[in-house]
C-alpha cells in the first residue's frame, strides 16, 4: 500500500498540472459513472493529502476523495507542456521518470488527447494538455467540503502537514495500553504511516514494537514523531522510502540497501549484526532487531 509520502507527491502533482484547469471527467470502467458526471466540466481548485487519503477539490463544493489501498495507482501523461510522474501508487515506481505522451514536440503543440483506456480505469481526468487515470482504488467517491472536513477529523495528525501538532500524537500514543507497533498503523493515531515507516522508525528509536504505548517516555514518543516527519519528507523528495545512512549501507547504492529492518528477516542488523526478526502483528508482518530494540 502506498504510504503517506506517495499521496503527498500525488497532491503536489495534481496541483502542479491540473489546478485551475477545467477537466473532462469520465469513468471508462463504468463503476464511477455517476460520480464522474458530477465532476465533469468542473475546475480543479486544489489538491490536498491527509495521510493516505487524497482530496481533489473542485468548484461547486465537490471533492473527489480517493484512497488507493493496496492496489490503486494513478497514471499520468500528456503533451510537451505537461509533466507528470509516469505512475504514482502501486506498484511503487514513484517519481522514477516522466513519460509525456502525445503530439507535443517541445513547442507546446496541440494536444491530441489521451490514449484509449488500458485496463479497468475507474476515473479519467483530461485537461487541455494532459490526462490522469485511476485504477484499483479502495475508495473513490464525490463528497462535499463539509464531508471532507468530517473525514479528515477522523484521522490523526499528518507528519507532512506543517499545521500538524506532534503533541497530539504524543498524547494519543502514550494514553493507550495498545502496543506501539499497532498504534502506528492506526490512521486515527497518526495519518500516513504504513508498514515500512513503522518498522524503520521504531528501529531508529530503539523501541520494541510490542511495547505498550503507556510505557513510552515522552521523549521517546516525541522522537517517533520527529523521525517520521524527517523520513517522510525524505520520501517526498526521493520518491521512495530510504531510511539508511550511507555509512549503514557501506557505500552501496541507496536502492540496494534502503532499509534497516523492513523485509530483512534473518539478515544481520546493520548496526549490531543480530539477525532481524519478524512476526505477525494485527494481521501484518512487523520487523525488528531483538538486540537494538530489546526494550
Residues covered by each model-derived region:
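Structured catalytic/nucleic-acid-binding cores of DNA maintenance enzymes
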Residues: 1-295
